[in-house]
């Protein structure tokens, strides 16, 4: 009897490698391959500083990421080779409080 070999078809899993900025707090750079910043603009790398490895993360099968939109990350990695996650805007607690008590926060209206 003749043996038949059937090749396994493996889909390419999507991974990303996440680096923390050494210059900017809560700023992260996602790339496709570890230590490969070849598709990241030089000016961005200069402002980002020395990348510090934070984690490697499989994107397939995930429903969401903590501080980034999964589909935006996947699209950016595919199209430009990187995704830059910036920190959330600072909370303006005074503005929130004044708004909750019905006061206008515009300096012109004071």
From Swiss-Prot:
- State the source organism's domain of life: Bacteria
Where is the sequence biased in composition, kind Polar residues? 97-110
Q: Which InterPro entries match?
A: YcgL-like_sf (IPR038068), YcgL_dom (IPR027354)
Q: Which PROSITE patterns match?
A: YCGL
- Per the UniProt entry, the disulfide pairs are none
Residue span, YcgL domain: 14-98
Tell me which stretches of the chain form a coiled coil.
Answer: none
Region: Disordered, residue numbers: 87-110
Q: Which HAMAP family match?
A: UPF0745
- Report what the protein is called: Protein YcgL
Q: Which gene encodes it?
A: ycgL
